[in-house]
Swiss-Prot record:
It is found in: Secreted, Extracellular space. This is Lipase. PROSITE patterns: LIPASE_SER. Limited proteolysis produces a smaller peptide starting at residue Ser-124, that has altered substrate specificity and biophysicochemical properties. The lineage of its organism: Eukaryota, Fungi, Fungi incertae sedis, Mucoromycota, Mucoromycotina. Disulfide bonds join C152-C391, C163-C166, C358-C367. Residues 50-69 are annotated as: Disordered. Belongs to the AB hydrolase superfamily. Lipase family. Keywords: Calcium, Cleavage on pair of basic residues, Disulfide bond, Hydrolase, Lipid degradation, Lipid metabolism, Metal-binding, Secreted, Signal.
């Protein structure tokens, strides 16, 4: 159990925390565009298409214990550097509001400079670090912008596609449905772009500010589709509250537009839900495959255990996760609690054009893991100069 109290500047992770505290036994209440109904577990819901057994096979790659050492390795290395240069992490940790999961909420002024972190072409377990191309950065920026639109009340629940980021990234977008749950405030929408030939499924993240937060619990729940896989109980519960609202809508859109691709995205908690949704779509909808289904997350937390991470990798579904500088959220729940990121990481190291890609499909000690435990809540609020958490 980890606790921290109010943050004087920046955002709290209020909705993220509510999901972290939400157990699988919670009673979910959800609704589509203002209506309300009771949702049940996605894994047990007869209204959903059945699981495709061949798409739920446990991963053959069992990984290694070293996969869970990337973050602890850098925490020790960077803490030693910090203390050898006169810093005192022990004094920072004396107040619960300074650390969460061992990570700093507010960056110390004398933290190790980010320039000491991984550089391009450096080797690590399972891949290398390369510089993102201009085209790749434009793509990452686009999905950060689309994820930001979910914070606009005019979009969810307003059903209006008229915000600044809306018109910038998908000018011909048509909202098919919005969805929301009352218990965990899970929100999102399904959007179609005929020019881009794309069906978007977008989840809203955290947007509550300056609140007191205590007793974050990192509980696992069995991930029923895949033997041995476990995911965060709160993330799964919050996701399951809305699956009935969006799933048939995506299916209807695929039937009407069979050549369109499906892209799932979200920021913060929305990133966790996007990953779960992407896997659910792949496991139940035979028309979707790595050729027409992709997942892009922005500042998303860790979702599951190593078996879940290796399973996501084994599906072949393209999964790109973007992390801004020292954003703390991608480092919770901590690796030390048994959580592991799947996906190719794109790390905004500085500015908006210095972006590194860790090519491994499982997180390594490079990219954003290279700066722990010196993280910051402020870097969670902006990606590629796009405000995340507010509609601007």
């Amino acid at each position: 159990m980890v606790s921290f109290i109010s943050i004087s500047q920046g955002v709290s992770l209020c909705l993220l925390v509510s999901s972290m505290m939400l157990g699988s036994s919670a009673v979910p209440v959800s609704g589509k565009s203002g209506s309300s109904n009771t949702a049940v577990s996605a894994s047990d819901n007869a209204a959903l298409p059945p699981l495709i057994s061949s798409r739920c096979a446990p991963p053959s790659n069992k990984g290694s214990k070293s996969d869970l050492q990337a973050e602890p390795y850098n925490m020790q290395k960077n803490t030693e550097w910090y203390e050898s240069h006169g810093g005192n992490l022990t004094s920072i940790g004396k107040r619960d509001d300074n650390l969460v999961g061992g990570m700093t909420l507010d960056l110390p002024s004398d933290a190790p400079p980010i320039s000491l972190s991984s550089s391009t072409n450096s080797a690590s377990d399972g891949g290398k670090v390369v510089a993102a191309t201009t085209a790749q950065i434009q793509e990452f920026t686009k999905y950060a912008g689309i994820a930001a639109t979910a914070y606009c009340r005019s979009v969810v629940p307003g059903n209006k596609w008229d915000c600044v980021q809306c018109q910038k990234w998908v000018p011909d977008g048509k909202i098919i449905t919005t969805f929301t749950s009352l218990l965990s405030d899970t929100n999102g929408y399904v959007l179609r772009s005929d020019k881009q030939k794309t069906i978007y499924l977008v989840f809203r993240g955290t947007n509550s500010f300056r609140s007191a937060i205590t007793d974050i619990v990192f509980n696992f729940s069995d991930y029923k589709p895949v033997k041995g896989a476990k995911v965060h109980a709160g993330f799964l519960s919050s996701y399951e509250q809305v699956v009935n609202d969006y799933f048939p809508v995506v299916q209807e859109q695929l039937t009407a537009h069979p050549t369109y691709k499906v892209i799932v995205t979200g920021h913060s908690l929305g990133g966790a839900q996007a990953l779960l949704a992407g896997m659910d779509l792949y496991q139940r909808e035979p028309r979707l495959s790595p050729k027409n289904l992709s997942i892009f997350t922005v500042g998303g937390p860790r979702v599951g255990n190593p078996t879940f991470a290796y399973y996501v990798e084994s599906t072949g579904i393209p999964f790109q996760r973007t992390v801004h500088k020292r954003d703390i959220v991608p480092h919770v729940p901590p690796q030390s609690f048994g959580f592991l990121h799947p996906g190719v990481e794109s790390w905004i190291k500085s500015g908006t054009s210095n972006v590194q890609i860790c090519t491994s499909e499982i997180e390594t000690k490079d990219c954003s893991n290279s700066i722990v435990p010196f993280t910051s809540i402020l870097d969670h609020l902006s990606y590629f100069d796009i405000n995340e958490g507010s509609c601007l």
